[in-house]
Curated annotation (Swiss-Prot):
The lineage of its organism: Eukaryota, Metazoa, Chordata, Craniata, Vertebrata. The gene is shha. Zn(2+) binds at residues 140, 147, 182. It comes from Danio rerio. It comes from the Eukaryota. A lipid is attached at residue 24 (N-palmitoyl cysteine). This is Sonic hedgehog protein. Ca(2+) 2 binds at residues 90, 126, 129, 131. Expressed in the ventral midline of the neural tube and brain. Also found in the notochord and in developing fin bud. In the developing brain, expression occurs in domains that include a discrete region in the floor of the diencephalon.
């Protein structure tokens, strides 16, 4: 019986994934096979994402120069990919040294270049710099940046080369000069390198019994305060963590409201429900990335009478905290520290994200019905291990295949995190 149930659940899961994938089809093209998307070349001096290189939304802050004698030199790894030409004008092999993340993105780009221009290879003119030839705090000093061209040095290709670099996953790409393209990545251990959508473990949720519980202590089956699609407060089943990490330090956005003064702390890619300052209609609220919320907008706060109330955002700042948790409820929403938030992240579409988690909700309800457990045994038996949940990891990977890269937050989860 148990085997049959598992087979049935896997079948339903697979079917739901296929349907969710097809639903991403544009308009009347629903269910049709997508044609390869057209690559739009970057313009001269354009950079993607459209923020400064060493900010949270791009490659993150400078962490210090690496020399051959420093402890961090072991973070660099040589790249001997035969499909990449290294200029290496210093004749020291320095241009081949880079972080593993930079190496992975560069190797991916090399394949794209050969596929796009048969007979042409990727060329690296500058990698790790140990001679001080760049400006202060350049990411070249950490092996996190490369300057690239094509092997034929055809400048008419550089705009498209920039776009290919974006598609390959570099965290910041800059059509810097007529002579080369500049690309960089996040640090391997950077708090910016892995974000996804999370709350700190100390954030509080409200329970149906009137008490409160820290997010990190939630167990499947706990009924927590959330909101339905009409904006009504409800108590919803906590189903799972899409990510559960007790140790990693991450950067969180802190969004603080005016009267009443409340704060919610969440990662950049997490969705928060907002209203424009010009309206009080809760039905017009939309889900926006925490990193895109601005002072003057409104968020939904649970007031003393237990009702949702729109309150103006007073200020926004960032802080580092250790530990991050991403809870999912049956309704796809959750009230954290008295402010209504989504359970989802990375893609700025609450409806699509909630649809994508339909198989997870189905599995929870079916397993709860077939294998009822008391709260203590459920706490011990079903609480997941640390790391990104396999289903969340799968959805993110599918999203990178099916959706345009600009539909995903630049600080989307690391599919290699554990």
């Amino acid at each position: 019986m148990r085997l049959l149930t598992r087979v049935l659940l896997v079948s339903l899961l697979t079917l739901s994934l296929v349907v969710s994938g097809l639903a991403c089809g544009p308009g009347r093209g629903y269910g049709r096979r997508r044609h390869p998307k057209k690559l739009t070349p970057l313009a001269y001096k354009q950079f993607i994402p459209n923020v400064a290189e060493k900010t949270l939304g791009a490659s993150g802050r400078y962490e210090g120069k690496i020399t051959r004698n420093s402890e961090r030199f072991k973070e660099l790894t040589p790249n001997y990919n035969p499909d990449i030409i290294f200029k290496d004008e210093e004749n020291t092999g320095a241009d081949r040294l880079m972080t593993q993340r930079c190496k992975d993105k560069l190797n991916s780009l090399a394949i794209s270049v050969m596929n796009h221009w048969p007979g042409v290879k990727l060329r690296v003119t500058e990698g790790w710099d140990e001679d001080g030839h760049h400006f202060e705090e350049s990411l070249h000093y950490e092996g996190r940046a490369v300057d690239i061209t094509t092997s034929d040095r055809d400048k008419s290709k550089y705009g498209t080369l920039s776009r290919l670099a974006v598609e390959a996953g570099f965290d910041w790409v800059y059509y810097e000069s007529k002579a080369h393209i500049h690309c960089s990545v996040k640090a391997e251990n950077s708090v910016a390198a892995k974000s996804g959508g999370c709350f700190p473990g100390s954030a509080l949720v409200s329970l149906q019994d009137g008490g409160q519980k820290a997010v990190k202590d939630l167990n499947p089956g706990d009924k927590v305060l959330a909101a339905d699609s009409a904006g009504n407060l409800v108590f919803s089943d906590f189903i799972m963590f899409t990510d559960r990490d007790s140790t990693t330090r991450r950067v969180f956005y802190v969004i603080e409201t005016q009267e009443p003064v409340e704060k919610i702390t969440l990662t950049a890619a997490h969705l928060l429900f907002v209203l424009d300052n010009s309206t009080e209609d809760l039905h017009t609220m939309t889900a926006a990335y925490a990193s895109s919320v601005r002072a003057g907008q409104k968020v939904m706060v649970v007031d003393d009478s237990g009702q949702l109330k729109s309150v103006i955002v007073q200020r926004i700042y960032t802080e580092e905290q250790r530990g991050s948790f991403a809870p999912v409820t049956a309704h796809g929403t959750i009230v954290v520290d008295r402010i209504l938030a989504s359970c989802y992240a990375v893609i700025e579409d609450q409806g699509l994200a909630h649809l994508a988690f339909a198989p997870a909700r189905l599995y929870y309800y079916v397993s709860s019905f077939l294998f009822p457990q008391n709260s203590s045994s459920r706490s011990n038996a079903t609480l997941q291990q640390e790391g990104v949940h396999w289903y969340s990891r799968l959805l993110y990977q599918m999203g990178t295949w099916l959706l345009d890269s600009n539909m995903l937050h630049p600080l989307g989860m690391s599919v290699n995190s554990s």
